[in-house]
Amino acid sequence: MVHFTAEEKAAVTSLWSKMNVEEAGGEALGRLLVVYPWTQRFFDSFGNLSSPSAILGNPKVKAHGKKVLTSFGDAIKNMDNLKPAFAKLSELHCDKLHVDPENFKLLGNVMVIILATHFGKEFTPEVQAAWQKLVSAVAIALAHKYH
């Protein structure tokens, strides 16, 4: 289990409270699909993913990105208990969707980039360290059900 200090929790929640989940979620998932094109195979039903502009303008990408980022909100509420909080999502992604758990790490890294672009100087090294710790812990929690 990962332990978050009071300072780390404050750094994460402070930035999260200013986050536009819809905008940043679509941006994060879109960036994942552009930068790591092999991840597109999990989103066949999303329609046109033929170019970066098609991906970033795709309403299904934006909607699912919002859903993904909303789950990060759940992570923030359950920072001290991530594995149980993500048990159902882990099972879904493992047993039903067969997502390579390495993709969770990639998405976490993309999330950190999105945060840096959105928050600039507010995204200090200390804030980045707290967020990097969180996205890594979420990736581990999501990979928990994998064999």
Swiss-Prot record:
InterPro entries per record: Globin, Globin-like_sf, Globin/Proto, Hemoglobin_b, Hemoglobin_oxygen_transport
Tell me if Heme is a UniProt keyword of this record.
yes
> Gene Ontology cellular component?
blood microparticle; cytosol; haptoglobin-hemoglobin complex; hemoglobin complex
Supply the Gene3D superfamilies for this chain: Globins
Report the PROSITE patterns cross-referenced here.
Answer: GLOBIN
Tissue specificity annotation: Red blood cells.
Sequence positions bearing Phosphoserine = S14, S51
User: Which keywords are on file for this protein?
Assistant: Heme, Iron, Metal-binding, Oxygen transport, Phosphoprotein, Transport
| Keyword Iron included in the entry's annotation | yes
Q: Which terms does the record give in the GO molecular function aspect?
A: heme binding; hemoglobin alpha binding; metal ion binding; oxygen binding; oxygen carrier activity
User: Which family does the record assign?
Assistant: Belongs to the globin family.
The subunit field of the Swiss-Prot or TrEMBL record says: Heterotetramer of two alpha chains and two epsilon chains in early embryonic hemoglobin Gower-2; two zeta chains and two epsilon chains in early embryonic hemoglobin Gower-1.
Q: State the protein's purpose.
A: The epsilon chain is a beta-type chain of early mammalian embryonic hemoglobin.
| Name of the protein described by the UniProt record | Hemoglobin subunit epsilon
